[in-house]
């Protein structure tokens, strides 16, 4: 069996994208997905994304973590699949698509892709961190000297010991100025730090506004893989009209024989 794939990246968060409108990809083959995502034995990626037909909107996004299991919403992956759908001539410059957490709008904006995220109404504020769900669960914690912080060790500990078997993504944040923050994220399912996390950047932007670290509702996030921006409105304790914006690029195409 030959599987044609497209390798994408959005601020260093990289994905294998596959056109599965004919439903030929073996989605229950966890080992295959894990091997394709392996950086030593496969293509190498933080996750694998299938584009499938939808009965109600332009297309459906099915996301797998690099461990082969179905994942929750992926913001950078969502931006990449919008680019992929345009590449396949399914859409022009805007779209509505279906994902595991509901429907999302996507737009091309000056070679960037802006993705509308779902509303956020529940934020758990603790002494040292915040917890919220932006399509995926996120722990947000401020630290000093983020550049030298041991994200892998502390992230793995919190992911496994604080959040149990289901786990959570863990974000560490350092403020740069009034509306700019540096972010590093340990992602569950990848079980490592990634160069960027879109739902994590979204969670950080909302968390910083909630903590009154910023009064801006258009926030810049600097990740190891590049820059993202998040804008939103807060109405009656609910964060709405949340948009994640950043680049999405096709790196190469190829065929996988299995």
Label each residue range with its predicted role:
Residues 1-110, 140-258:
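A glycine-rich beta-to-alpha transition motif near the start of alpha/beta enzyme domains, typified by
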Residues 115-128, 153-158:
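Active-site glycine-rich loop that binds ribose-phosphate moieties when present
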Residues 132:
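Short glycine/Trp-rich loop-beta-loop segment that forms part of the substrate-binding cleft
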């Amino acid at each position: 069996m030959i599987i044609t794939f497209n390798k994408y990246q959005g601020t260093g968060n990289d994905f294998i994208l596959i056109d599965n409108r004919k439903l030929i990809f073996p989605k229950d083959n966890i080992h295959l997905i894990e091997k394709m995502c392996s950086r030593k034995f496969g293509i190498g990626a933080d996750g694998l994304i299938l584009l499938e037909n939808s009965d109600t909107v332009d297309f459906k996004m099915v996301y797998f973590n690099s461990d082969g299991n179905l994942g929750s919403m992926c913001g950078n992956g969502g931006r990449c699949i919008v680019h992929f759908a345009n590449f396949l001539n399914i859409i022009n410059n805007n779209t509505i698509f279906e994902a595991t957490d509901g429907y999302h709008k996507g737009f091309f904006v000056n070679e960037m892709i802006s993705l509308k995220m779902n509303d956020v109404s529940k934020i758990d504020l603790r002494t040292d961190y915040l917890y919220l769900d932006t399509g995926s669960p996120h722990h947000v914690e401020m630290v000093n000297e983020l550049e030298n912080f041991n994200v892998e060790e502390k992230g793995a500990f919190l992911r496994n010991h604080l959040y149990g078997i289901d786990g959570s993504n863990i974000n560490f944040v350092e403020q740069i100025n009034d509306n700019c923050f540096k972010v590093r994220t340990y992602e569950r399912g990848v079980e490592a730090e990634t160069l960027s996390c879109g739902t994590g950047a979204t969670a950080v932007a909302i968390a910083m506004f909630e903590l009154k670290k910023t009064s801006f509702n258009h926030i810049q996030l600097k990740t190891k893989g590049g820059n993202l921006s998040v804008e939103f409105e807060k109405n009656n304790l609910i964060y709405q009209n949340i948009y994640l914006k950043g680049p999405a690029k096709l790196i190469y195409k190829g065929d996988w024989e299995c």
